[in-house]
């Protein structure tokens, strides 16, 4: 299946990069596939690395998020934010201590009400999230 780039993603990545935010991709998809998709769309340049779930439970366990955090040399999840489109990923990341941003994705539409209730901040579009942060700063944690 061909990966598509959501509108506003590159603008958000560029803005975060300009602010010195270090970024990676932590995914349930295997790393070579992640890197190939990001490279084909010119997005890998914004990320320091990609990491996939090694745990058979996937994102039901925080291993992929903690692995990414530790690769940055950071130990405390409070110092990082996880962007997710799945309620399982959001719940797991929050339980591990990460700030969370829920981003709407059409294949996960049925879970949107749950995502908006669970994430620290939820946005239907990447542009809306960026505009909110630029106007008000990061959203407080729930």
Question: PLM features: residue spans?
Answer:
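Asp-based, Mg2+/Mn2+-dependent phosphohydrolase catalytic module
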Residues: 14, 31, 35-142
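Short secondary-structure boundary micro-motifs
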Residues: 20, 25-26, 40, 106
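Short, acidic loop-to-helix structural element flanking the phosphoryl-transfer center
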Residues: 1-25, 31, 35
């Amino acid at each position: 299946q061909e990966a598509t780039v959501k509108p506003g993603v590159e603008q958000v990545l560029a803005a975060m990069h300009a602010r010195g935010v270090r970024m990676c991709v932590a995914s349930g998809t295997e790393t070579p596939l992640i890197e190939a998709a990001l490279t084909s769309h010119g997005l890998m340049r914004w990320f320091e690395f990609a990491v996939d779930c090694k745990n058979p439970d996937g994102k039901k366990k925080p291993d992929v998020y903690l692995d990414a955090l530790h690769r940055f040399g950071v130990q405390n999840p409070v110092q990082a934010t996880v962007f997710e489109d799945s309620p399982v990923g959001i719940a797991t990341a929050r339980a591990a201590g990460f700030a969370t941003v829920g981003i709407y994705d059409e294949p996960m539409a049925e879970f949107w009400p749950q995502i908006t209730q669970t994430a620290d901040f939820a946005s239907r579009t990447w542009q809306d999230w960026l505009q909110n942060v630029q106007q008000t700063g990061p959203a407080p944690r729930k």
